[in-house]
Curated annotation (Swiss-Prot):
GO cellular component: cytoplasm
Chain's gene name: rsmH
Function according to Swiss-Prot or TrEMBL: Specifically methylates the N4 position of cytidine in position 1402 (C1402) of 16S rRNA.
Organism: Aeromonas hydrophila subsp. hydrophila (strain ATCC 7966 / DSM 30187 / BCRC 13018 / CCUG 14551 / JCM 1027 / KCTC 2358 / NCIMB 9240 / NCTC 8049)
Residue span of region Disordered: 286-306
Superkingdom, natural source: Bacteria
PANTHER family per record: 12S RRNA N4-METHYLCYTIDINE METHYLTRANSFERASE, S-ADENOSYL-METHYLTRANSFERASE MRAW
EC number in record: 2.1.1.199
Protein's name in the database: Ribosomal RNA small subunit methyltransferase H
A Pfam cross-reference name: Methyltransf_5
Top-rank EC class of the record's enzyme: transferase
Protein family according to the UniProt entry: Belongs to the methyltransferase superfamily. RsmH family.
GO molecular function list: rRNA (cytosine-N4-)-methyltransferase activity
Keyword Chaperone: no
Extent of Basic and acidic residues compositional bias: 287-298
Lineage of source species: Bacteria, Pseudomonadati, Pseudomonadota, Gammaproteobacteria, Aeromonadales
Length: 312
């Protein structure tokens, strides 16, 4: 395994502040990663507090094992399983805060062997959990032009999706794509787009990673799970890193702030209308400070949104 750079947790204090930690509360860190948010939450919990962390990356699980604290528990699995994990522990509707730090982490990006980065040569893997599911290389070896183009367009908003997809399918007849640099160099050759400050392969790598890990489906399932696990006044604190993630989070919060659509002409009282609302936004969407961006350029695109669970 190649040496990964030290992970700098993005919007660390802001995301945890959004949880409004109660010393004796129950909290869930849905994306343990290298434990930045979890460790800060533990610092703010009292002796009767509880923190359950989740991650599907075996390296994150190994990092979590270093935390010897009776208030802390780590679950190996996708964060989409939040409702199931909490149901098993008898904690549905009892959680005071749920935090999600979405996307790929710096250690995952910086470890060439994980296959997430087009900047370093490594096996074309891209799985958050390398022990489960198909790798990017396996999918690219089998998918047809239309499927590849759809993924690049849908999850990467790549303008030249069809051109890149055709090149992949054409080239793999003689030389399958199994290395990150091999794929990145081909995309740079066939993609005429010159986005300022962005490598030609950025959008394609993002798209393939999102597809391989079912990231948007995972997020949607986890957000719906949050409604099941959060207690009244419990907080949801979510950090997104690209427009697809943030759009999903923003629309989810807005949908449950408004409540269900009611056909025109059906008379409902204010109390009945309010009863359908499940969330309310807390503050405005927050971006990292200029200082944080200067310290950690990967934080530039991050957005934090916080919502509070309403009683039904």
């Amino acid at each position: 395994m190649t040496q990964a750079a030290e992970h700098i947790t993005v919007l660390l204090h802001e995301a945890v502040e959004g949880l409004a930690i109660k010393p004796d509360g129950i909290y869930v860190d849905g994306t343990f990663g290298r434990g930045g948010h979890s460790r800060l939450i533990l610092q703010q919990l009292g002796p009767n507090g509880r923190l359950i962390a989740i991650d599907r990356d075996p390296q994150a699980i190994a990092e979590a094992a270093k935390i010897q604290d009776p208030r802390f528990e780590i679950v190996h699995g996708p964060f989409s399983g939040i409702a199931s994990y909490l149901d098993e522990r008898g904690l549905l509707g009892k959680v005071d805060g749920f935090l999600l730090d979405l996307g790929v982490s710096s250690p995952q990006l910086d470890d060439a062997e994980r296959g997430f980065s087009f900047m370093k040569d490594g096996p074309l893997d891209m799985r958050m959990d390398p022990t489960s599911g198909q790798s990017a290389a396996e999918w690219l070896a089998r998918a047809d032009v239309d499927d590849i183009a759809w993924v690049l367009k849908t999850f990467g908003e790549e303008r030249f999706a069809k051109k890149i997809a055709r090149a992949i399918v054409h080239d793999r007849v003689t030389e399958p794509y199994v290395r990150t640099r091999q794929l990145a160099e081909m995309i740079a050759r066939v993609n005429p787009s010159k986005e300022k400050g962005k490598h030609a392969a950025t959008r394609s790598f993002q798209a393939i990673r999102i597809y391989i890990n079912s990231e948007l489906d995972e997020i949607e399932t986890a957000l719906n799970g949050a409604l099941q696990v959060l207690a009244p006044e419990g907080r949801l604190s979510v950090i997104s890193f690209h427009s697809l993630e943030d759009r999903l989070v923003k629309h989810f919060i807005r949908k449950h702030e408004k409540g269900p659509e009611v056909p025109h002409g059906i008379p409902l009282t204010e109390a009945q209308l309010a009863g359908g609302r499940k969330l309310k936004s807390v503050g405005k969407a927050l971006k990292p400070s200029e200082h944080e961006v200067n310290e950690n350029s990967r934080s530039r695109s991050s957005v934090l949104r916080v919502a509070q669970r309403l009683a039904e």
